[in-house]
């Protein structure tokens, strides 16, 4: 299979990447320890040095690193807890169509009603505002600032504003540089921490290592997981020094010292030592952009929308049933893609950053053929508008509902 799902963004460098395999096998063969809680180990020190020297210092970024646990939601929970401690306030601002996780704190930030239907825990102390583009051409940052400036608006002064620069599960909605800069300015004006969730669209997925680089932001806290561990479980925070106000033992967890993730993560961060790697991602991004716009033009009467950047792209076909049918047709042809968006109406593409251009073109051709098969079939007849009754459980990897198995080595990278 060609995998354009990439473990929901965990496998940015492909399945069984040879650099990670070699590093892991060498480490294990030398009896390197797998787990050390939060104690110092050689592999942990080497990972920290790699991220500082290869990622942070070249970008003139000064952050402290906190390992929070194995998954992205652990990073979000730690960021919320720290922001509330630093600012001595409880309220948080999040955005429409946001997705930040399924534990109670991160779930409160998540916009999709479907994820809340079976969870009756507290969702207090979070307000959702319209994301960039949610109200068409209206600048939604104006509404946020208006309510913050008005002491009678009913909006408490928040400890933090949490956002994704590209909403992945929300439908590949890309915030503009101007909007992000205005949100950052609002944070500075009202003494609010800016937390960027770069769990899925960071780690090079947007074309730069951090998704916010293109607009010059310097968030107070950055949440990273998924690909940062080289395909192994890891989550961490990058924290501005003045916000690092934890006292010993205030935020702990058992699985914060996954040495196998340190080894794999360090090996794959080395891609970023070579500027050509980022240029190659930009070239592949243009290939995907051109292919999706060609598909949208071919079916212009359906008014489909193409959104994305780097190697995170979405084709909004306006209907969850249609998008799901395209995903399933592609799978049967050997291409793995998922769906996303409020109604699962977006076909989502996350090819590995390391994919060969020939494989990328092959996958895009499969997608085009699958769309032709579905549109010429019966699905298109019932999908002229967005179907609000779409079961959002399809947001998971579509292959999980099919009775198949495959070895990792069968997936091309």
Model-found features: residue ranges?
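Conserved N-terminal phosphate-binding loop of PLP-dependent enzymes in the Aspartate aminotransferase
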Residues: 1-394, 398-413
């Amino acid at each position: 299979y060609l995998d354009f799902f990439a473990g929901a963004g965990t496998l940015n460098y492909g399945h069984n990447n040879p650099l990670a395999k070699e590093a892991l096998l060498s480490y294990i063969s030398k009896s390197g320890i797998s787990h050390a809680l939060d104690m110092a180990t050689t592999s942990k020190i080497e990972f920290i040095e790699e991220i500082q020297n290869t990622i942070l210092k070249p970008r003139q970024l000064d952050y402290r690193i906190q390992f929070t646990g194995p998954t992205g939601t652990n990073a979000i929970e730690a960021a919320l807890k720290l922001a509330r401690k630093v600012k001595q306030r409880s309220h948080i601002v999040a955005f429409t169509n946001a997705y930040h996780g399924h534990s109670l704190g991160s779930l409160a930030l998540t916009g999709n009603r479907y994820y809340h239907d079976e969870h009756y825990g507290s969702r207090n102390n979070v307000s959702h505002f319209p994301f960039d583009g949610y109200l068409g051409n209206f600048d939604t940052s104006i509404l946020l600032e208006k309510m913050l400036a008005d002491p009678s608006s009913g909006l408490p002064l928040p400890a933090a504003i949490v956002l994704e620069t590209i909403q992945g599960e929300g439908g590949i909605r890309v915030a503009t540089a101007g909007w992000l800069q205005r949100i950052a300015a609002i944070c500075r004006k009202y003494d609010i921490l800016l937390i960027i969730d770069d769990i899925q669209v960071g780690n090079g997925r947007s074309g730069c290592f951090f998704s916010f680089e293109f607009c010059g932001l310097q968030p107070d806290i950055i949440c990273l997981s998924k690909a940062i561990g080289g395909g192994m479980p890891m989550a961490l925070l990058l924290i501005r020094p003045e916000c690092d106000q934890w006292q010993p033992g205030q935020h702990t967890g058992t699985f914060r010292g996954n040495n196998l993730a340190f080894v794999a993560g360090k090996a794959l961060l080395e891609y970023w030592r070579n500027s050509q790697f980022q240029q190659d991602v930009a070239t592949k991004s243009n290939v995907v952009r051109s292919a999706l716009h060609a598909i949208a033009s071919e079916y212009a009467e359906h008014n489909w929308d193409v959104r994305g950047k780097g190697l995170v792209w979405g084709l909004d076909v306006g209907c969850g049933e249609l998008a799901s049918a395209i995903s399933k047709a592609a799978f049967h042809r050997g291409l793995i893609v998922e769906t996303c968006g409020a109604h699962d109406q977006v076909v989502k593409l996350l090819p590995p950053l390391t994919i060969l251009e020939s494989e990328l073109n092959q996958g895009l051709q499969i997608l085009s053929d699958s769309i032709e098969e579905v549109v010429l079939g019966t699905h298109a007849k019932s999908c002229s508008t967005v179907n609000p009754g779409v079961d959002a459980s399809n947001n998971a990897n579509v292959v999980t509902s099919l009775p198949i198995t495959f070895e990792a080595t069968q997936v091309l990278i």
